[in-house]
Amino acid sequence: MVRHQPLQYYEPQLCLSCLTGIYGCRWKRYQRSHDDTTPWERLWFLLLTFTFGLTLTWLYFWWEVHNDYDEFNWYLYNRMGYWSDWPVPILVTTAAAFAYIAGLLVLALCHIAVGQQMNLHWLHKIGLVVILASTVVAMSAVAQLWEDEWEVLLISLQGTAPFLHVGAVAAVTMLSWIVAGQFARAERTSSQVTILCTFFTVVFALYLAPLTISSPCIMEKKDLGPKPALIGHRGAPMLAPEHTLMSFRKALEQKLYGLQADITISLDGVPFLMHDTTLRRTTNVEEEFPELARRPASMLNWTTLQRLNAGQWFLKTDPFWTASSLSPSDHREAQNQSICSLAELLELAKGNATLLLNLRDPPREHPYRSSFINVTLEAVLHSGFPQHQVMWLPSRQRPLVRKVAPGFQQTSGSKEAVASLRRGHIQRLNLRYTQVSRQELRDYASWNLSVNLYTVNAPWLFSLLWCAGVPSVTSDNSHALSQVPSPLWIMPPDEYCLMWVTADLVSFTLIVGIFVLQKWRLGGIRSYNPEQIMLSAAVRRTSRDVSIMKEKLIFSEISDGVEVSDVLSVCSDNSYDTYANSTATPVGPRGGGSHTKTLIERSGR
C-alpha cells in the first residue's frame, strides 16, 4: 500500500481570507498575491483615504451642530412648508457612511501591513464614489444655505482640539507600525528616504499643532468668571409648548434670570406671543379654520386666536424629543394650552424675571402697522412691570421708547462699533454666539456693554462661553444648563503644555522603537514561503530565481517530510527507488527525472 505525503501543507489562514475576501472578494488562496499594488489601485486607496477624511469632517460637523438642530429644522420648515426632524436621519446616514468607509480603510491598511496586493472590489468602488459624491454635494448645499453654521465647526475646535490632538498623536503612533514595515521592506535607499522624510514631516507638524490651538478654557481656575445668566428662549420650549403660560411657568421654576418673547399684534390690537408669521406650526388652525391657515397670525382678531389650541402640536411633533419625559399631569396640561397674551406674561413674570422683548412687524395692511410699538409700550407700562427689568430689542422708534420708558434696557440686535452704540444709548447687545470673539467681548465689557448670546443649548458650548466671560445666554435647554456646576473642562496653561509635550515625547519614543523593531524584523528578509512563490512570480526576484527556489523547497520538503524507509519497503520496484538511491537532480534518468518534473509541476499548480 502506498502512502502519499503531501509536499506542502497550507494552514487555513481564515483571517487573511476574510481580509482579502471582504476588501476585494478574493476568498481563495490562489486569488491572493504578494505583488506590488498597481498604480490604479493605489489611486483608489488615495481616494478612499480622502473620502475617509471628508466623511469624518462631515460627521463631526453634524455631531457638533446639534446645538442648532432646531434652527435647521425651522429653516427647512420655511422652505418646505412642513415640520420634520431632519438632522437625525442625516446624522444616522452620515455615521453609517463613515463606518463603511472607515472599515474599508482599515482593511486596506491591513493589506499593506501583511504585504498583500490591494484590489478593491468594484462594488466597493461604486459605494465609495457614491458616498464621496453625496458628501461633496451635501457639504456644498450646507455651505450655500447654512453658511454661518460652518463657524460652529471652528468654535467647537476650541473645546475639542486639545483632546483631538492627543487622539491624533495616538493614531499616528499606531500607524507608524505600517509605515515602518514599508520602510524596512524598501530595497532602494531613495524609497526609504522618501518614506522617512514624508512620515516624520507629518509627525512633527502634528507634534507642534498645539502651538496654534487657542481655547478660552485653557486658563487658570482663579480667572474663571461668574456663570452666565440664563434667559429662557420663549420660556422652556423643551418642557412645554413654546410661548405658552406653561412654558414660561416652567422657566420661572428654574429661577432663570430672564425670559425671551416674540410679540405680535392681533387685528384688533391685542399684543400676543407668537414667533412664526402664520399659525400652522404651533396651533391647530388647519383643523379649526383651514381657510385661515396661511393667513398671517396678526391678521386674526384675539377672539379667534383664543379658540386655537397651542399645545397639541408639541406632543405630536415632539421637536426636542422631550415630550415622552413629561409627567401625566404635564402631558394633560400641555395638551390644553392656548395662545398667550403679553398681558398674561407680564403678570406672571412681574418681580420674578427680566424680559427680553422682541416685536414682529405686522403686514402693511394691518390697522396697527404704524402704532404697534405704542400699543406694546402701553401694555407694558400699564401692567406695572418694572422698567429696569425690560430689555427692549426693537430698533424702530428707539428715541420715542427712551422718552416714554426711560428705564428700559435698550438692547441692540446688530453688531456695531462701540462709538455708535454709545450714541444710541445702547446698554446691551443681543447677538448670535458666532458673531462675537473673545477680544470683542473684552472690548464691550470695558465700555460697560453687556452681551447676551443666543441660542445656546449644548453644554459644551455653554462651557466655552462661560470660560470666555459671556455675561448671559438665551437657551432652549435652560433646565439642563442651570444644572451645570462648572465648565466641562478647564486646564491651566502649564498643565496643558505638560500634557501635549508628554504625549509628543512618548509618541516619538514609541515611533523610533517601532522603526528599529521593524527594521530588525524585516530588513534582512529575502526568503520566500511556498505561497509567495506560487502566487507571485516577480516579488524581489527574477523568474529564474523563483524557479530555483521552487526546486529547493520541494526537495527540502521531500527530505524532511517523506517517510523514505516506509516508501522503500513498500515500493522498492517503482520509480521511488530513484530518489532513495541517487542524489536528487532537477533533470535525471527516465524514472527519477520525469517524476521530479511531475512533482515540480504539481507544486507549481
Curated annotation (Swiss-Prot):
TM annotation in the entry: 43-63, 90-110, 126-146, 161-181, 193-213, 497-517
Annotated S-S bridges: 15-18, 25-571
Xref: SUPFAM superfamilies: PLC-like phosphodiesterases
Glycosylated residues, chain numbering: 301, 336, 352, 374, 448
Presence of keyword RNA-binding: no
PTM per Swiss-Prot/TrEMBL: Intramolecular disulfide bond between Cys-25 and Cys-571 is reduced by PRDX1.
Region of interest: Disordered: 582-605
Cytoplasmic side: 1-42, 111-125, 182-192, 518-605
Catalytic activity: a 1,2-diacyl-sn-glycero-3-phospho-(1D-myo-inositol-4,5-bisphosphate) + H2O = 1D-myo-inositol 1,4,5-trisphosphate + a 1,2-diacyl-sn-glycerol + H(+); sn-glycerol 3-phosphocholine + H2O = sn-glycerol 3-phosphate + choline + H(+)
Ranges per topology, Extracellular: 64-89, 147-160, 214-496
Keywords from the UniProt entry: Cell projection, Cytoplasm, Disulfide bond, Glycoprotein, Hydrolase, Lipid metabolism, Membrane, Neurogenesis, Transmembrane, Transmembrane helix
Record EC number: 3.1.4.2, 3.1.4.11
Domain GP-PDE: 228-485
Membrane topology: Multi-pass membrane protein
Biological process annotations from GO: lipid metabolic process; nervous system development; positive regulation of neuron differentiation
Localization of this protein: Endomembrane system; Cytoplasm, Perinuclear region; Cell projection, Growth cone
Gene Ontology CC: endomembrane system; growth cone; perinuclear region of cytoplasm; plasma membrane
Molecular function GO terms recorded: glycerophosphocholine phosphodiesterase activity; glycerophosphodiester phosphodiesterase activity; phosphatidylinositol-4,5-bisphosphate phospholipase C activity
Assembly notes: Interacts with PRDX1; forms a mixed-disulfide with PRDX1, leading to disrupt intramolecular disulfide bond between Cys-25 and Cys-571.
Role played: Glycerophosphodiester phosphodiesterase that promotes neurite formation and drives spinal motor neuron differentiation. Mediates the cleavage of glycosylphosphatidylinositol (GPI) anchor of target proteins: removes the GPI-anchor of RECK, leading to release RECK from the plasma membrane. May contribute to the osmotic regulation of cellular glycerophosphocholine.
Similarity comment: family membership: Belongs to the glycerophosphoryl diester phosphodiesterase family.
Protein's name according to its UniProt entry: Glycerophosphodiester phosphodiesterase domain-containing protein 5
Annotated source species: Homo sapiens (Human)
Gene behind this protein: GDPD5
